[in-house]
């Protein structure tokens, strides 16, 4: 069973958020949330809150957090706010404050195996 949580328009550039996502992907979700709480990176707090939200969604569906693993963490560009900086001779240079959308999907291996086994039994009948 897949559990997901989505956070949109996070004010961290997708490149920086992707670095955190790669770091965390191989860990257990509870361990990842604990590590992100102590990390001094730009998007660590936002990613921690999102992982905790996904774990809470799993509790609502009565799944144990210890059995969950990351299926994938998807980070995509969420648009950009255009800003201007004053420069010499009355001109302005533009720059973008980029945002990102993050989607965390957790999966439970035990639930997955039982559903696959039940599908095989149904196909034999």
Model-derived segments and spans:
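Short, charged/polar surface micro-motifs in flexible loops or helix N-caps
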Residues: 76-81
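C-terminal structural segments of small proteins and small subunits
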Residues: 90-98
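Ribosome large-subunit tunnel/peptidyl-transferase-proximal elements
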Residues: 1-75, 99-115, 119-124
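Short, low-complexity, polybasic intrinsically disordered segments
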Residues: 82-91
């Amino acid at each position: 069973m897949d559990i997901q949580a989505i956070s949109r328009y996070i004010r961290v550039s997708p490149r920086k958020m992707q670095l955190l996502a790669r770091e965390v992907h191989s860990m257990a979700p509870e361990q990842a949330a604990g590590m992100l709480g102590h990390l001094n990176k730009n998007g660590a707090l936002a990613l921690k809150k999102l992982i905790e939200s996904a774990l809470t969604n799993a509790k609502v569906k009565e799944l144990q957090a210890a059995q969950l693993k990351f299926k994938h963490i998807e980070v995509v560009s969420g648009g950009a706010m255009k800003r201007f900086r004053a420069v010499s001779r009355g001109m302005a240079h533009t720059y973008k404050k980029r945002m990102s959308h993050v989607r965390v999907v957790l999966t439970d291996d035990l639930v997955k195996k039982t559903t696959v086994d039940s599908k095989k039994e149904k196909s034999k009948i």
